[in-house]
């Protein structure tokens, strides 16, 4: 994203593919990633995932980075400590997703100023919860940006089941954006 002065904001999005801690959270279905779970994750495997993710962060070198498929704030903090390129600030909310999968945003406070954040609750047509859409309003070089970090319901369980869920999520996001644009037709929005 470039300003009129030519200065750019480096923005990215990354699916970190199930960045989970090793503890079994009894309130979610995360046990396959816990120690002793079906995925056979060990401390060494977890540490290697953090190391590899930190290397990707270095390659991306983003000022603002949306992430999906993170379990909680703890793993984001661990990732931030494994990466020594920047001291990112973390925006994360625990969502009601049954598997404990959340969205998050990392940002460099030296470059991007956060004004407001909120999770947008995403209730599916059959009433079941899924991960929230993360909304972040921030400022860069005098420009107000509206960022929506989202990871729509997966095709896990088949496309026939997934399509109505994904459509509902698309409608929710479209309504949020329409409301933002009705208040400010020139709003700068990133998805």
Q: Which residues make up each language-model segment?
A:
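Intrinsic structural disorder
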Residues: 1, 15, 161-165
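Structured beta-strand-rich core segments of catalytic domains in phosphoester-bond hydrolases
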Residues: 64, 70-144, 148, 152-153
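Metal-dependent phosphoester/phosphodiester hydrolase catalytic core
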Residues: 25, 140-183
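N-terminal, active-site-proximal structural segment of metallo-dependent hydrolase catalytic domains
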Residues: 2-101, 170-175
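Beta-sheet entry/capping signal
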Residues: 8-10, 63-64, 144-146, 188-190
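Short coil-to-helix leader/linker segments, especially the first N-terminal amphipathic alpha-helix
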Residues: 1-2, 129
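Metal-dependent active-site segment of extracytoplasmic phospho-/sulfohydrolases and closely related
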Residues: 181-191
């Amino acid at each position: 994203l470039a300003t009129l002065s030519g200065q750019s904001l480096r923005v990215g999005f990354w699916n970190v593919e199930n960045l989970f801690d090793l503890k079994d959270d009894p309130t979610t279905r995360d046990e396959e990633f816990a120690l002793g779970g079906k995925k056979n994750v060990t401390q060494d495997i977890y540490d290697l995932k953090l190391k590899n993710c930190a290397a990707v962060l270095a390659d991306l070198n983003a000022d603002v980075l949306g992430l999906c498929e993170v379990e909680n704030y703890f793993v984001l903090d661990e990732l931030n400590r494994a990466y020594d390129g920047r001291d990112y600030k973390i925006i994360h909310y625990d969502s009601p997703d049954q598997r404990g999968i959340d969205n998050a945003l990392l940002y460099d406070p030296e470059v991007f100023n956060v004004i407001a954040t909120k999770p947008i609750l995403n209730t599916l047509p059959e009433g079941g919860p899924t991960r929230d859409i993360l909304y972040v309003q921030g400022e860069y070089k005098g420009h107000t940006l509206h960022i929506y970090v989202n990871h729509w319901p997966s095709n896990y369980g088949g496309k026939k089941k997934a399509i109505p869920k994904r459509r509902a999520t698309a409608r929710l996001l479209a309504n949020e954006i329409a409301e933002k644009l009705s208040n400010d037709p020139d709003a700068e929005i990133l998805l």
